């Protein structure tokens, strides 16, 4: 296991470059984000080769094309040298990504964000909030299936799920 802090910058840069080379699966984004390099900035890194896991701590910023994640801690899990899960924790953690070139960025925040790269699903846990195309979802748990365009939300008593859906403008509807 490696433990790196700001005091060991040369080794940190080398390890980050190595991790970046392995962390670009095609399922990482719907746009051309998957073809972009992943850039990760943090104060500390713990890389556990046997556990196939890298944990970044301290003002973590993850960028890959339009994908942006900001959190206090981010754990990246690998299988066969490919990223399979990204777990962001914060108060809150933030996620933003442009899913289609003609749409606004999807924005999300929660105490915990789990991005399943293979399934293209995002789980938001704890004071979860998701905004896309003006539609707004709030709850204790939000599961967003990006591929299917499906949102499942749950909340605990006494809180309820809150949702605001924007109507389609007549100018947005294509006549056939």
Kindly give the residue locations of the regions a language model identified:
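Mature-chain termini and adjacent capping regions
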Residues: 1-176
